[in-house]
Regions:
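Alpha-helical membrane-inserting segments
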Residues: 152-155, 172, 176
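Interfacial loop/helix-cap signal at membrane boundaries in integral membrane proteins
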Residues: 111-162
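Membrane-interface amphipathic helices and adjacent TM-edge segments
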Residues: 101, 173-185
Length: 185
């Protein structure tokens, strides 16, 4: 019997770990429609395990993500642990059984990418990975910060300068709220 298996290893905690509430660095996964983010120090104290039907897992830092996407429609066990090295892995719960002169193929996708919205969205779309955009942490106010990011990015592409993009974004926000501000006086 054979089991599908994948593992990511990180030797040590990054030296420039910010440990700042705005940006998550550490273990990240989206398993059965649940986003799970675990810090390095939490995993050093206690390992994390979850059985899931679908999803992805990885280790991310400020600018990069390394992720595994297990075979679809198969139950797998995800584990984040620390034994002299940080490990994020999965193993299928059901074995692959082969008879003589038979073969089987399973695809495990590995993605090592920059945390750029266009790159991550490209992988999510081309490889049909649900909620892969969550590797980029927009914070708990993502419903505000993500559209603001796209607006500033649009102005940057239009104007070629982030300073001008921020000024243009500020003008648009001020214009949107002008009637409300004018009404209060």
């Amino acid at each position: 019997d054979f089991y599908s298996y994948g593992q990511i290893i990180r030797n040590k905690i990054p030296r420039d770990l910010t440990d700042f509430y705005i940006n998550h660095e550490g273990f990240v996964s989206h398993l059965d429609d649940e986003l799970i983010e675990e810090d390095y120090d939490d995993i050093q104290e206690k390992k994390f395990t979850k059985i899931a039907q679908k999803g992805w897992l990885g280790i991310g830092d400020k600018y990069w993500i390394t992720s595994l996407i297990p075979p679809s429609n198969k139950e797998f066990k995800t584990t984040f642990d620390y034994k002299k090295k940080f490990r994020a892995n999965f193993i299928a719960t059901e074995p692959l059984t082969l008879n003589e002169k038979s073969s089987v193929e399973e695809i495990v996708q590995v993605i090592v990418a920059a945390k750029r919205v266009d790159v991550i969205d490209g992988y999510a779309q081309s490889l049909d990975i649900d909620n892969f955009d969550l590797v980029i942490d927009f914070g708990f106010l993502y419903f505000i910060t993500k559209p603001l990011f796209f607006a500033i990015d649009y102005f940057f592409k239009l104007l070629g300068n982030y300073g001008l993009a921020i000024i243009a974004m500020t003008i648009c926000i001020r214009l949107a709220f002008f009637p409300l501000a004018n009404f209060s006086f």
